[in-house]
């Protein structure tokens, strides 16, 4: 084994793309609403492996590729489910990209009883604060959000799905 490679990483290839997705749905049950939101976001037929909030260095933000059904997809996500008719719920995800491309990016997720605009503003501010905490220079922030007005039982979902070129 190459002495420069961390033994853990010798077994796992780091993802090199990130796709920001968001969706919402109504459902008969909370799980059906969540599943519908995943389908609406384009990632309903894969297995999400929930990760914390780090984007590998030099990973690119790309449109969601066609993922193989059943694939294990590392994903940072936020979601909210509500059964209050008329309530507005939103979910948002952001990725902060460093100026120094040898550093990792930072993914932040947010969900709340608020507008899409408020959720996206909050998640972008969280990414900025995360970079300030690390003392890193920010190049840019990419984000996406979704808003849903509950009819009976609804879900809003936003995610950063990591994958491979």
Curated annotation (Swiss-Prot):
Q: Name one GO biological process term.
A: arginine catabolic process
User: E.C. number, please?
Assistant: 4.1.1.19
Q: How does activity depend on temperature?
A: Thermostable.
Q: Which residue ranges run through the membrane?
A: none
Question: What keywords tag this UniProt record?
Answer: Decarboxylase, Lyase, Pyruvate
Names of required cofactors: pyruvate
- Heme listed as a keyword: no
Which Gene3D superfamilies has this protein been placed in? 3.30.60.30, Pyruvoyl-Dependent Histidine Decarboxylase, subunit B
Q: List site positions: Cleavage (non-hydrolytic).
A: 52-53
Can the keyword Lyase be found in this entry's annotation? Answer: yes
Catalytic reactions on record? L-arginine + H(+) = agmatine + CO2
Q: What GO MF annotations does this protein's record show?
A: arginine decarboxylase activity
Q: How does it assemble?
A: Trimer of an alpha-beta dimer.
Say which family it is in. Answer: Belongs to the PdaD family.
What is this protein identified as?
Pyruvoyl-dependent arginine decarboxylase
Annotated gene: pdaD
């Amino acid at each position: 084994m190459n002495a420069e490679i961390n033994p853990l990483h010798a077994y796992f290839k780091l993802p090199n793309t990130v796709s920001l997705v968001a969706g919402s749905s109504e459902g008969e049950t909370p799980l059906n609403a969540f599943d519908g939101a995943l389908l609406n976001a384009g990632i309903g037929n894969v297995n999400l492996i929930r990760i914390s909030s780090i984007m590998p260095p030099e990973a690119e933000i790309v449109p969601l590729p066609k993922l193989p059904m059943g694939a294990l997809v590392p994903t940072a996500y936020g979601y909210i489910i509500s059964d209050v008719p008329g309530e507005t719920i939103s979910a948002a995800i952001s990725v902060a990209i460093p100026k120094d491309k040898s550093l990792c990016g930072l993914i932040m997720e947010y969900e709340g009883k608020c507008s899409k605009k408020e959720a996206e503003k909050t998640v972008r501010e969280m990414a900025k604060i995360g970079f300030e905490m690390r003392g890193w220079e920010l190049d840019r922030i990419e984000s996406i959000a979704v808003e849903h007005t509950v009819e009976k039982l609804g879900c809003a979902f936003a995610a950063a799905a990591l994958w491979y070129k």
